[in-house]
Amino acid sequence: MPMAELIKNVKKESAFTLADLVDVEEGRVNSLTLSQTPATKVTLFAIDADAGMSSHAAGGDAMVNVLEGSGEVVINGVPHVLSAGQSIVIPAGAPHSVRGVTAFKMLLVVVFAS
């Protein structure tokens, strides 16, 4: 019986650059899901400057990892500006929003209680 494909939308056994997998488009938020299981969701985002996602809450802890550019993550009303190479964890259930300070790309990893 074949194994389930747990990571998708990338070529297996080949090196790649995460930021190259998703493109910034003017005024938009683009995403590419790399993995989704009952316990985790891994998604790449490309967010244009001043575009973003309005306030919402996730059912699990979410770690934002900025790959390129600069973005603002507001958690419980407190703004955090992150640049390439920086990360932040959003606690499960915390209201948060994300906005591009410049065009930016991020990897979002959400871990759910199992």
List each language-model region with its residue ranges.
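A cytosolic small-molecule/anion-sensing beta-strand core signal
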Residues: P38, L67-E68, S83-A84, T102
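Structural motif
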Residues: K41, S70-E72, P79, P95, ...
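Ligand-binding loop in jelly-roll beta-barrel domains
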Residues: A92-S114
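A short, N-terminal "cap"/entry segment at the start of jelly-roll beta-barrel domains
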Residues: M1-A39, V74
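Short, conserved beta-strand element in jelly-roll/cupin
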Residues: A46-D48, A58-V73
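Conserved short histidine dyad/triad with adjacent acidic residue
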Residues: R28, P38-A58
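Histidine-centered metal-chelating micro-motifs
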Residues: G52-S54, I88, A92-S97
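Short acidic-glycine-tyrosine-enriched beta hairpin
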Residues: G77-A92
